[in-house]
């Protein structure tokens, strides 16, 4: 600690803090323009000049560290005149269009001019007038207003680490520009990912959101805090609302999640909520599914028909003839009500959702080894790790804000190991790139364990005190020598050895993975192998380590938590446990609940095709595009006697329904999402749903009442009270407690602070359980007829199958599907860039444009699954992981 005096006030501060930081901490104001608390201080603007006793000249407070005995004066006549002169210089170079500027009311230059009484600039300096750049769908750049503070440059280079923009020119001609190889280019040509974080930190009107142009002044907006509706990171947002419309979005400063940073979808992809294609009234099909049509109906008629048909099917065929799909895009409260309808009113455990296709192997694998099938650590932890092992996750495109934490850790000195067949962006930041063949992850992971055990790098004390089954694992991995694993995976033996040593030595090592690990015939075994690796090295139960599945959708974790699975009630309480069933049935006021696990999503589709499943209720899911072997899915849905779809758009699945119920988007309702890090967070209603659309919880509550269930909920908060009373991990959650930063479950009581790190003292199951798992080849392998390996995944500008395609800007950036093919393979086959080619598998074929690249290895092709025009899942296989029943979405052609 150091002692110093600021403006006569004696203060004590930690060594290394800057004068500006210490002053602000003690309530002393020093003006700044270039400074931003989340960016490296550079002292560009000079507004923060202060007088330091004994110094030869004034010093910039933003980047001058405090020292013992310093005596600082932040405001003297000389300093004040210098600040006025700086502001006058900036105004002399600045357009005087404050009356019409989008930044008016939120402009820091305007604030400084007001504070110091500088009305306009009169210095004889001029700047060449520059064109206003509007070449992309998201950001308007007016560099005439640029004050060369460098904030946007630092956000791009230090936070996003894209290095697209930089300072160009000198003196009064200095400004910011996008550059590539020394030449000025458009943002897109420069490699911009349009996160818009530069817009968020810009202190003036040089960078603005195109969507907000002319839509309102700062003081006219109602600002509503919410949570992003895209991926599972749970980024906090501020919605800017005027005249019942969301005009723009800014990142909300929650330091435990996104710290204000966003990606292109979170910041600019919100406009789908106002798309004219929204369903605004209930629809009822007239005629059959082949030649029939939809007509609009009242809510009374639509819900009465749904109630009648579901009751009729139960009466005629039994409860097991019904199936329900929960939604990873709807709130916890809504998922809770749907599974309650299925189990408590209609008597079936045939309840599942899209987690079956993505992370059901995570739930099965981590529940077996650790006792809890969720991310062990916090997103914020990632930045403090010493080693980060990313496997099966294209993090920069699928979870861009988590990728910022990875980049932050690397900048701090962490070693990044990336295991991926494709040259994903994180490879550019990696210490090691393990380019394994698709489907060989288990061999690779067992190979890492072989090295760790052989070289005795494992944590003997942790294993002895907190785990069981290690000796069996030790014997099992003996055969996975680096040489043998290299032969199977294609990864050099030396890289396998170095990766094992780096991970084991940490000191803090974290694992991040996604669907590249889970969507395999050995998906559950892959997850267990990751758990084995972490337990062997004692890398569980502390900050900066753990095993961290990155969940794909905004509330996929919550849908699982709420019992959107066929074998568990909310809180992962087994349906087979009589005590659990009694607790729920007593609270719900219904007879005993069904005690046998229900059908999974894929089993429901098979049962529908066989004529055993007669009716389905699908909430906010689109299996016609997202499920594997979609031809099979379409046939299954056609075979149903009755199909209800509740959604905000007429999706490919909704088009096959008998009744379509229009729900509400995230901005149009209250409720909670649970993010990938187990953080339960509040949604706040910002606008009304369009037309007669209703919040989904209200639709489900009305249907429950119509079907004879007597409980009428007054609000989602009341539903959460019921959830908390039945679910131990949510027991201490109330809406009031979630208002600040949310809470990470388990939250065991109203006094419990939440759990950022799982398994600190012991595992949820008691002892961690090592599992012996062995590599086996993929469900299909290349042959002469189908020689290519085919994999699927996401694109940065899209999310799943519908909502991002209803966002004008996102669709403009990526309007059509492409298939990535290696440049050597393309040359051999005579395929040119942009040429339409046909991709054929044993199950179907699609026509799509070729993207020729060295990003993907020879013998492999990659395609996004977002597009109905070329549905990737026409090609995929419905083979299942034997444990989690997850389908294999990594087939061959």
UniProtKB/Swiss-Prot annotation:
Positions with a binding annotation for [4Fe-4S] cluster 1: 146, 149, 152, 202
GO cellular component terms listed in the entry, alphabetical order: cytoplasm; membrane
Cofactor, free-text remark: Binds 1 [2Fe-2S] cluster. Binds 3 [4Fe-4S] clusters.
Biological process per Gene Ontology, one example term: respiratory electron transport chain
Entry's localization field: Cytoplasm
Highest taxon of the lineage: Bacteria
Influence of temperature on activity: Optimum temperature is 85 degrees Celsius. In the absence of substrates, the enzyme is stable at 70 degrees Celsius but is rapidly inactivated at temperatures above 73 degrees Celsius.
Enzyme class label: oxidoreductase
InterPro entries in alphabetical order: 2Fe-2S_ferredoxin-like_sf, 2Fe-2S_ferredoxin-type, 4Fe4S_Fe-S-bd, 4Fe4S_Fe_S_CS, Asp_de-COase-like_dom_sf, CT_Formate-Dh_H, Formate_Dh-H_N, Formate_DH_asu
Residues reported to bind [4Fe-4S] cluster 3: 228, 231, 235, 263
EC code: 1.17.1.10
Cofactor: [2Fe-2S] cluster; [4Fe-4S] cluster; W-bis(molybdopterin guanine dinucleotide)
Catalytic activity: formate + NADP(+) = CO2 + NADPH
Keywords of this entry: 2Fe-2S, 4Fe-4S, Cytoplasm, Iron, Iron-sulfur, Metal-binding, NADP, Oxidoreductase, Repeat, Tungsten
Annotated binding of [4Fe-4S] cluster 2, by residue: 156, 192, 195, 198
Domain spans labelled 2Fe-2S ferredoxin-type: 1-78
Note: The active enzyme contains per mol 2 mol of tungsten, 2 mol of selenium, 36 mol of iron, and perhaps as many as 50 mol of inorganic sulfur, but no molybdenum.
Summary of the function given for this chain in its UniProt record: Component of a dehydrogenase that catalyzes the NADP-dependent reduction of CO(2) to formate, the first step in the synthesis of the methyl group of acetate during synthesis of acetate from CO(2). In vitro, can use methyl viologen and benzyl viologen in addition to its natural electron acceptor.
Family (UniProt): In the C-terminal section; belongs to the prokaryotic molybdopterin-containing oxidoreductase family.
Subunit structure: Heterotetramer composed of two alpha (FdhA) and two beta (FdhB) subunits.
Protein name: NADP(+)-dependent formate dehydrogenase subunit alpha
Originating gene: fdhA
């Amino acid at each position: 600690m150091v002692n110093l005096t600021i403006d006569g006030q004696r203060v004590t501060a930690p060594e290394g803090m800057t004068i500006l930081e210490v002053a602000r901490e003690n309530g002393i104001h020093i003006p700044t323009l270039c400074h931003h608390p989340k960016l490296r201080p550079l002292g560009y603007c000079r507004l923060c000049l202060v007088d330091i006793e004994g110094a030869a000249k004034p010093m910039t407070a933003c980047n001058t560290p405090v020292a013992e005995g310093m005596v600082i004066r932040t405001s003297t006549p000389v300093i004040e005149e210098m600040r006025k002169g700086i502001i006058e210089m900036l105004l002399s170079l600045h357009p005087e269009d404050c009356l019409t500027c989008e930044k008016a009311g939120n402009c820091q230059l305007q604030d400084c001019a007001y504070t110091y009484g500088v009305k306009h600039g009169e210095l004889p300096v001029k700047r060449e007038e520059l064109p206003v750049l509007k070449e992309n769908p998201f950001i308007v750049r007016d560099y005439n207003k640029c004050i060369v503070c460098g904030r946007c440059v630092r956000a791009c280079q230090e936070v996003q680490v894209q290095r697209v923009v930089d300072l160009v020119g000198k003196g009064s001609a200095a400004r910011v520009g996008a550059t590539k190889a020394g030449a000025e280019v458009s943002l897109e040509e420069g490699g911009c990912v349009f996160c818009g974080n530069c817009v968020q930190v810009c202190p003036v009107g040089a960078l603005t959101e195109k969507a907000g142009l002319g839509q309102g002044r700062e003081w006219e907006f109602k600002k509503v805090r919410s949570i992003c509706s895209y991926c599972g990171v749970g980024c906090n947002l501020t919605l800017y609302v005027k005249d019942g419309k969301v005009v723009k979005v800014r990142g909300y400063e929650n330091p435990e999640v996104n710290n204000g940073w966003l990606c292109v979808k979170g910041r600019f992809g919100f406009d789908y909520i106002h798309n004219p294609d929204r369903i605004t009234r209930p629809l009822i099909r007239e005629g059959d599914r082949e030649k029939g049509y939809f007509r609009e109906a009242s809510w009374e008629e639509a819900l009465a028909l749904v109630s009648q048909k579901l009751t009729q099917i139960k009466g005629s065929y039994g409860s097991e003839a019904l199936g329900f799909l929960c939604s990873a895009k709807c709130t916890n409260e809504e998922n809770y009500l749907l599974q309650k309808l299925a189990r408590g009113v209609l008597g079936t455990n045939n309840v599942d959702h899209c987690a079956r296709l993505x992370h059901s192997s995570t739930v099965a694998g981590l529940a077996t080894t650790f006792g809890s099938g969720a991310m062990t650590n916090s997103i914020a932890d990632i930045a403090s790790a010493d080693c980060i092992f990313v496997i099966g996750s294209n993090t920069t495109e699928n979870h861009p804000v988590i990728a910022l934490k990875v980049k932050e850790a690397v900048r701090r000195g962490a070693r990044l190991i990336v295991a991926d067949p494709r040259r994903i962006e994180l490879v550019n930041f990696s210490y090691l790139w393990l380019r394994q063949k698709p489907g060989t992850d288990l061999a690779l992971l067992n190979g890492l364990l072989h090295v760790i055990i052989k070289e005795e790098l494992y944590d003997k004390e942790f294993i002895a005190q907190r785990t069981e089954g290690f000796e069996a694992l030790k014997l099992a991995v003996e055969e996975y020598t680096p040489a043998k694993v290299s032969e199977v995976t294609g990864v050099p033996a030396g890289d396998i050895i170095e990766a094992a040593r780096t991970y084991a030595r940490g000191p803090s090592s974290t694992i991040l993975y996604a669907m590249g690990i889970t969507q395999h015939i050995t998906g559950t075994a892959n997850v267990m192998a990751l758990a084995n690796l972490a337990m062997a090295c004692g890398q569980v139960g502390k900050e900066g380590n753990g095993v961290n599945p990155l969940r794909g959708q905004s509330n996929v974790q919550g849908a699982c938590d709420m019992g959107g699975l066929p074998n568990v009630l909310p809180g992962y309480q087994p349906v087979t446990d009589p005590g659990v069933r009694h607790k729920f049935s007593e609270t719900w006021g219904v007879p005993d609940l069904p005690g046998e696990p229900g059908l999974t999503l894929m089993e429901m589709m098979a049962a529908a095709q066989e004529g055993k499943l007669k009716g389905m209720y699908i909430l906010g899911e689109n299996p016609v595009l997202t499920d594997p072997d979609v031809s099979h899915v379409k046939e299954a849905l056609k075979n149903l006697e009755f199909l209800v779809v509740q959604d905000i758009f007429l999706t490919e699945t909704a088009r096959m329904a008998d009744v379509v119920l229009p729900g509400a988007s995230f901005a149009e309702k209250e409720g909670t999402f649970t993010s990938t890090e187990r953080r339960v967070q509040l949604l706040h209603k910002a606008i009304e749903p369009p037309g007669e659309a209703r919040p989904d919880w209200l639709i489900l509550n009305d249907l429950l009442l119509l079907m004879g269930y007597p409980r009428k909920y007054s609000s989602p908060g009341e539903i959460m009270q019921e959830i908390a009373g039945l679910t131990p991990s949510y027991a201490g959650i109330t809406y009031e407690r979630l208002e600040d930063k949310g809470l990470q479950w388990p939250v065991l009581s109203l006094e419990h602070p939440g759990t950022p790190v799982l398994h600190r003292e012991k595992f949820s199951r008691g002892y961690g359980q090592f599992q012996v798992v062995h590599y086996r080849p993929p469900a299909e392998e290349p042959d002469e007829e189908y020689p290519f390996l085919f994999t699927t995944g996401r694109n940065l500008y899209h999310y799943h199958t519908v909502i991002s395609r209803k966002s004008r800007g996102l669709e403009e950036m990526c309007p059509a599907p492409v298939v990535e093919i290696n440049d050597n393979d393309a040359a051999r086959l005579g395929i040119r860039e942009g040429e339409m080619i046909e991709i054929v598998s044993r199950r179907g074929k699609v026509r799509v444009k070729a993207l020729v690249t060295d990003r993907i290895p020879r013998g492999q092709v990659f395609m996004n699954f977002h597009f109905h025009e070329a549905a990737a899942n026409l090609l995929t296989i419905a083979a299942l992981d034997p444990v989690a029943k997850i389908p294999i979405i990594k087939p061959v052609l």
